[in-house]
């Protein structure tokens, strides 16, 4: 039941794109999906081992430890999600341009919607693990509702805005059910407390990403002269530069402001005794 939402997304999207746009656009969208799906699969595989032990953690009954681990995973996922969409946004169109040609490049609006969907799925991929750990399976209506919202919005918006409208179905359905309902349900039935602190921290992560990205834009506009569209060598060089600049800004801000990220980083590098968490 809980896989239905994702199944509908992957099976229905190409059909709806073909119906409201064209078969050619299905292929164009598929080029972007290949790159992004591989990235998402890699990231999810990195967390498989960590999130597999959540059930045992919950069984111990130490609520402080449970929430500490929850926020560590949460912060790292939001960090990775932010980093991934930043790099894809700045690199995917130049890559497609060099790989296939200018005619295969999707509009900036479509790319933003695709990346918004990617960000939501990477950053919120852990909630299900905690819900399963608590044995909270009885919101069986959720995946069915997600699938229904997805299809309805995709049909309505697709008939108006084409590809962008179809993709909005994925974003809005996932946002409402997985990003809003699931955390609320977890706090309500799992942690047995109000979810106010959760939303405060999520807004904090979003603000950190926004400020970091804006800071990079200022640097890019005034100091970076490399064009990623010239050849693969320039693309790689540009990728290295922006990864370093944004990585430093984003990492420092997450470490300074995000308690969960700071806790994970200190534990990962074994520097807890030198850093106040």
Task: Describe each PLM feature range.
Residues 33, 74-88, 164-188, 202-206:
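Short alpha-helical transmembrane segments in multi-pass integral membrane proteins
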Residues 88-121, 191, 226-231:
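Interfacial segments at transmembrane-helix termini and the short loops linking adjacent helices
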Residues 30, 62-91, 108-111, 199, ...:
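Interfacial transmembrane-helix starts/ends
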Residues 147-179, 193, 217-241:
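Membrane-interface helix-loop junctions in multi-pass transport and translocation proteins
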Residues 192-193, 216-277:
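Membrane-proximal transmembrane or re-entrant/amphipathic helices at the cytosolic face
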Residues 32, 36-74, 128-133:
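Helix-loop junctions and terminal segments of transmembrane helices
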Residues 115-146, 150, 155-156:
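Membrane-interface junctions at transmembrane-helix termini in multi-pass inner-membrane proteins
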Residues 15-37, 65, 103-109, 235-238:
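Interfacial/gating helices of multi-pass transporter permease domains
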């Amino acid at each position: 039941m809980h896989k239905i939402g994702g199944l509908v997304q992957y099976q229905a999207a190409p059909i709806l794109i073909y119906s409201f746009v064209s078969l050619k656009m299905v292929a164009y969208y598929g080029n972007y999906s290949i790159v992004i799906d591989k990235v998402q699969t890699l990231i999810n595989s990195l967390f498989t081992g960590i999130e597999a032990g959540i059930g045992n953690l919950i069984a111990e009954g130490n609520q402080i430890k449970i929430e500490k681990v929850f926020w560590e995973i949460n912060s790292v996922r939001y960090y990775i999600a932010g980093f991934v969409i930043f790099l894809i946004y700045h690199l995917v169109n130049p890559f497609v341009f060099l790989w296939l040609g200018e005619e295969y490049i999707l509009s900036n609006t479509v790319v933003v919607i695709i990346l918004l969907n990617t960000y939501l799925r990477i950053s919120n991929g852990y909630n299900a693990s905690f819900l399963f750990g608590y044995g909270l399976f009885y919101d069986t209506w959720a995946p069915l509702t997600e699938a229904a919202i997805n299809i309805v919005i995709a049909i309505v918006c697709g008939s108006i805005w084409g590809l962008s409208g179809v993709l909005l179905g994925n974003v809005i359905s996932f946002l409402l059910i997985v990003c809003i309902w699931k955390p609320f349900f977890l706090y309500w039935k799992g942690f047995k407390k109000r979810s106010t602190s959760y939303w405060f921290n999520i807004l904090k992560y979003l603000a950190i990403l926004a400020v970091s990205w804006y800071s990079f834009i200022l640097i890019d506009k005034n100091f970076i002269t490399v064009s990623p569209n010239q050849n693969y060598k320039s693309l790689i060089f540009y990728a290295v530069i922006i990864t370093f600049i944004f990585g430093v800004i984003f990492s420092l801000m997450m470490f300074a402001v995000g308690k969960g990220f700071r806790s994970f980083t200190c534990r990962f590098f074994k520097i807890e005794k030198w850093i106040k968490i």
